């Protein structure tokens, strides 16, 4: 497939082991043997031993009226390892609150998956050239003390 990353020996060592490329994808196999890509390992929050897939939380939040963009990521926590954090860019003319977001999530997912930290952003979330959210930049930009 590939020999490695150009001029990035650390990245090569992390992703290729004994000739096998570890893509970082998380998948499930259904009862018929079909494989479904669920998320990426990097896009999973490990909260107190529970795996929380960012894509699952994002899909629930996107169903809430007034959400233009959202991105879920892990926030370091001394007790649980990570907590769920979400940055939301509301649609123009809408009024979202942390309480309304948590209430919506509580009706559609397990309690431990509900975001503890919620940031309502005044600008669109940062993206790369292919349109993916830059979660690392979001983490650096946001302060847990400013979350709702």
Regions found by a protein language model. Name each.
Residues 140-148:
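Acidic/polar alpha-helix N-cap and adjacent early helical turns
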Residues 127:
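Catalytic cores of nucleic-acid endonucleases
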Residues 134:
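Conserved phosphate-binding loops in nucleotide/dinucleotide-binding enzymes
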């Amino acid at each position: 497939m590939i020999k490695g990353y150009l001029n990035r020996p650390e990245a090569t060592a992390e992703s290729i082991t004994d000739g096998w490329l570890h893509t970082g994808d998380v998948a499930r196999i259904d009862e018929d043997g079909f494989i479904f890509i669920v998320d990426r390992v990097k896009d999973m929050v490990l909260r107190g031993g529970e795996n929380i897939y960012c894509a699952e939380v994002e899909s629930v939040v996107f169903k809430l009226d007034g959400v233009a963009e959202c991105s879920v990521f892990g926030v370091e926590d001394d007790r649980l390892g990570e907590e769920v954090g979400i940055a939301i860019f509301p649609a123009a003319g809408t009024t979202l609150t942390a309480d309304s977001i948590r209430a919506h999530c509580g009706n559609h997912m397990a309690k431990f998956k509900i975001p503890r930290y919620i940031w309502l952003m005044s600008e669109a979330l940062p993206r790369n050239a292919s349109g993916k959210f830059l979660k690392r930049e979001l983490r650096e930009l946001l302060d847990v003390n400013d979350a709702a």
